[in-house]
Amino acid sequence: MAERILLINPNSSQSCTDGIAAAVAPYAAPGLPRLDVVKIEEGPPAIVTWRDWYGIAEPLCRMVEREAADAYILACVSDPGLEAVRTVTDRPVFGPLRCAVAAAMMRGERFGIIAFTDKSKPRQRRALQAMGVETRLAGTIPLNLDMEVLTDPLAPRARLAEAAKELVAMGAESVILGCAGMAGHRNFTEDACGVPVIEPCQAAVAQAILAVVSARGDRMRIAAE
């Protein structure tokens, strides 16, 4: 049976889900795990508040319990439900924010985050504190745009370019797109600011592929013994 990586968008936005799928599509290739992208139908339109963040943990757990996969990605850049979901599966579970931070630190000493809203900042700061890397953050700039504006092919781009350039001026050597709704704007933002721009769902897929393919190698070695 083909290996499967399941990306779960915890919000109910179809445009956000479609953007995630398009962003990770280049990572699908013969011989690699299949990438499936789904959304939580009963989820909020976006993960904005702490209530959204905490409330979505149980629906995420239920989906992981009923959907078999070789790895899971919780496709929101505040990593909601990460600890809870890890208790209901023995498969690897990835948070895009943590994966993006790891990727950013491989590209430079300091990074910046373009956040979804002001309310995103405390949740992302908590994750950075848990990772012990808060001092590597050059700054965070929120866009404060609605999800459906953020996922529009053109509407948020002037603001994204402005925010990315401001983060570079603050000392960022790479920039993280701090919402999965920004997934379709990575190339544009990188061209605008001149430093590496990390799309977190792509970073998480790269780590998930590594985990799944490594496990494949372990199984083949055990079978040969």
Residue ranges and their predicted role:
Residues 37-61, 148-153:
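N-terminal beta-loop-helix "entrance" segment that forms/cooperates
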Residues 86-107, 189-208:
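Short, acidic/small-residue loops that bind anionic groups at enzyme active sites
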Residues 7-8, 70-76, 172-179:
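Periplasmic-binding protein-like
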Residues 3-28:
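N-terminal beta1-alpha1 ligand-phosphate binding loop
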Residues 119-178:
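Active-site rim beta-loop-alpha module in soluble metabolic enzymes
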Residues 208-216:
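Short, hydrophobic alpha-helical segments
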Residues 6-8, 111-114:
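Conserved beta-strand elements of the Class I
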Residues 54-69, 157-171:
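Short, well-structured alpha-helical segments in soluble
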